[in-house]
């Protein structure tokens, strides 16, 4: 039976990381179920949810990825995902969503804590956080 694996790659962002992962996975006949990435201050966090064909071992995949990514100074973590967990995740994609937009010239940790306290109070999970503004100039941060 096919299995599901979440591959999390992280480290200093550089060209070719996604290619290195994809090339490494190619020999296992893996299908990509989902993919996403974020880069904050040149630090990459890449997640790829994959379908592993029956007969392929998670340990072989992790070893291949670790070898490939060590060559480009990246790290990898592989997490098995149960079929039940995956099915629940897929079933939730059509559920209603709430969007919160936080508008401020300057955001303090207390602002983020106040907003997330409300989400916690109502049992809501944060699916995605996106910065809509430009990056803050560190030397001018107190002017905001």
Model-derived segments and spans:
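A conserved regulatory-domain signal marking ACT and ACT-like small-molecule sensing domains
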Residues: 1-144
